[in-house]
């Protein structure tokens, strides 16, 4: 939920950045696309801690993230901690985090050499939408109804936020 050793301690998390990194590198080297949760703006997240977290984040082979900004909940230990982070600062940090992971995801998709295995889930504006084995979105132009089908794609274009293909 964070990539700063100090922040994990403040958040009372048991995982460790270096052991997490080793695990993620191992899984990534075996062809897995990886994602994680990340809490932005938790009390105590100083500028120094944020800088360390972003430096560490660049080292992680992540392709997806479920990021959210901390929201105070009465009755929790975090709610009474000093150094609450202002919303505008948390928003800037959130956007920085999303940009880093979006870039990592784009590079992952650009460098992928495996055929995509895609489950087509819906059709929108005449295009079929599905997710591949790496949980990346793929938009397919097809004259054939593909909803509910598994398709295998090896010729596709990598766009900023998705892959695009034509099914013949």
Listing of model-derived features with the role each one plays in the protein:
Residues 1-64, 75-89:
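Conserved non-cysteine loop/helix-boundary elements of the Radical SAM core domain that shape
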Residues 70:
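Short, ordered loop/turn segments at secondary-structure junctions
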């Amino acid at each position: 939920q964070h990539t700063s050793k100090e922040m994990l301690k403040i958040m009372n998390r048991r995982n460790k950045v270096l052991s997490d990194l080793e695990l993620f590198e191992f899984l990534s080297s075996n062809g897995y696309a990886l994602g994680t949760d990340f809490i932005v703006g938790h009390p105590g997240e100083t500028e120094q801690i944020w800088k360390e977290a972003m430096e560490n984040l660049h080292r992680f082979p992540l392709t997806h993230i479920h990021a959210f900004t901390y929201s105070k909940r009465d009755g929790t230990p975090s709610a009474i901690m000093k150094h609450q982070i202002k919303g505008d600062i948390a928003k800037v940090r959130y956007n920085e985090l999303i940009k880093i992971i979006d870039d990592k995801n784009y590079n992952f998709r650009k460098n992928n050499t495996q055929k995509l295995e895609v489950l087509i889930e819906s059709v929108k504006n005449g295009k079929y939408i599905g997710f591949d084995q790496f949980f990346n979105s793929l938009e397919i132009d097809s004259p054939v109804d593909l909803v509910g089908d598994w398709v295998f794609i090896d010729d596709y274009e990598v766009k900023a936020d998705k892959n695009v293909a034509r099914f013949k």
